[in-house]
Amino acid sequence: MSDKKIKGLEWQEKPLSDNERLKTDSNFLRGTILDDLKDGLTGGFKGDNFQLIRFHGMYEQDDRDIRAERLEEKLEPLKFMLLRCRLPGGIIKPYQWIEIDKFAREHTRYQSIRLTNRQTFQYHGVPKGKLQPMHRLLHSIGLDSIATAADMNRNVLCTSNPIESELHQQAYEFAKKISEHLLPRSRGYLDVWVDGKKVESSDDLLKIEDEPILGKTYLPRKFKTAVAIPPLNDVDVYANDLNFIAIQDENGQLCGFNVLVGGGLSFEHGNTKTYPNVAYSLGFVPLEHTLAAAEGVVKTQRDFGNRSDRKNARVRYTVQNMTLDGFRAEVERCMNIKFEPTRPYEFTERGDRIGWVKGIDNNWHLTLFIESGRITDKPEKPLMTGVLELAKVHKGDFRITANQNLIVANVAEQDKAQIEAIARQYGLIQEISKLRENAMSCVSLPTCPLAMAEAERVLPDFISELDKVLSKHNVADESIITRITGCPNGCRRAMLAEIGLVGKAIGRYNLHIGGDRAGLRIPRLYKENITLQEIVNEIDQLVARWATERQTNEAFGDFVIRSNIIAPVVNAHIDFWDATKIIPTTII
């Protein structure tokens, strides 16, 4: 960490969090993980290793459905790991899918593959004894899970725009470059998981494994990056610490990016020092300075981000402490150039184009709706087998979207009928409402240790109830962006939904309304600590008014604000917790 101290960063006078000690003592993230792998007395990791495995893309979890039962039997919780792959832009080849499918079936407790809204896949329920084989498998097919969790730059998102294929490819290449550029330089991941060799700390190692961008204590907190291609904001570009909005020149070629910082959706119930936030614009950079801008933002966060209080350690709090102008000036100093004025752009939609679309290169792309991103086999819907069968014949690639769906991309005209037949056979093509198409949930119970309420397991029935409400008021063909998360950690971006549910306790949620369709506005708390049925009743009343009082093409989230049902969140750090403090201004 830098020795720099500037006005407004009072945290620098306070003790560092223990995570900073942990990273310093970790021998560049190796810890004693190899020793723990040999310990068969527990299914989990001890001491610092419990946290260190996160830097390698894993979390220790257990099955909370049977936790009490095992406690009665005097057994430790049934521990296992979540593995999150690094997959910039969400592109994966069919041969890679075949291998990850095989591992999921043979070695995970839940025999499923979970698509995430960060455009990658997760395994749930991997036993400790299968971790090294899993990482070696990923390595053998050109994948890894480096830096998909913990205090690093996580999986980089990129708009899944199959129509503008050339522009998408250009932006995707930059998403990959950004991901690679911001990776840790340490060989700790390979030493532990692939080579399985113990490396002792030494002065020579310190010289070899210098971390010129991240530093030896890495970043103060998680760091998320996205690349968006207007007019589609499928990646929720305002929700990330660092964001790049692709700008085209007069010939339709990528010429640079608008750079935004300070987005993030996590907060803590009742803690008014925490808040969700939409990102602020720093300005425009031409293509040749893109990596310098990314590095400059990361270095600024590295040096000035809060390392004392992890609840205030994300980039948005650093921007608040330094001021936006102060943050911009430090980034410009790091990259040795000035930002140009922000270039004009417009986002008009956020969801995926479900079904077939044709690209400008005449290839076809089939977007499959995957509810909550869960790919598994059920008697009525053998989705996992269906995707496997597609992988066996598909000649293009798969793209995981930021809405947890799957695109069968680059299908030739002559292969289209075969792809569609397989997808229909296994229930991968289905008739769904617009409401369901635009709904998301986090995993939550039974595996997430932070979950306060259900999410994925209640979403299907909850959306069915809301579908009835929309039909009742003759707006069944309309879309309301609805998201459920089991806690306020923000994993499924409920704080950018028109209707956002945030878990408060088992069976109870806080209801937020008033986000917009473009993903520019934070929804405000409307009702606190109520049941799902009470939420349905509240939405019934709101939709009744929306259906009869709205203006032409007025979205639900815009209506509840125009009608003064709820006040907008204008400056989240000022008015998220108290609408009486609103100071009218622009959001970005």
UniProtKB/Swiss-Prot annotation:
Binds 1 siroheme per subunit. Siroheme binds at C491. Its cofactor is siroheme; [4Fe-4S] cluster. Pathway: Sulfur metabolism; hydrogen sulfide biosynthesis; hydrogen sulfide from sulfite (NADPH route): step 1/1. GO terms for cellular component: sulfite reductase complex (NADPH). Disulfide bonds: none annotated. GO terms for biological process: cysteine biosynthetic process; hydrogen sulfide biosynthetic process; sulfate assimilation. SUPFAM superfamilies: Nitrite and sulphite reductase 4Fe-4S domain-like (SSF56014), Nitrite/Sulfite reductase N-terminal domain-like (SSF55124). Gene3D superfamilies: 3.90.480.20, Sulfite Reductase Hemoprotein, domain 1. The keyword 4Fe-4S applies. [4Fe-4S] cluster binds at C442, C448, C487, C491. It catalyses: hydrogen sulfide + 3 NADP(+) + 3 H2O = sulfite + 3 NADPH + 4 H(+). Its EC number is 1.8.1.2. Alpha(8)-beta(8). The alpha component is a flavoprotein, the beta component is a hemoprotein. PANTHER family: SULFITE REDUCTASE [NADPH] SUBUNIT BETA, SULFITE REDUCTASE [NADPH] SUBUNIT BETA-RELATED. HAMAP family: CysI. Component of the sulfite reductase complex that catalyzes the 6-electron reduction of sulfite to sulfide. This is one of several activities required for the biosynthesis of L-cysteine from sulfate. This is Sulfite reductase [NADPH] hemoprotein beta-component. It comes from Actinobacillus pleuropneumoniae serotype 3 (strain JL03). The lineage of its organism: Bacteria, Pseudomonadati, Pseudomonadota, Gammaproteobacteria, Pasteurellales. The gene is cysI.
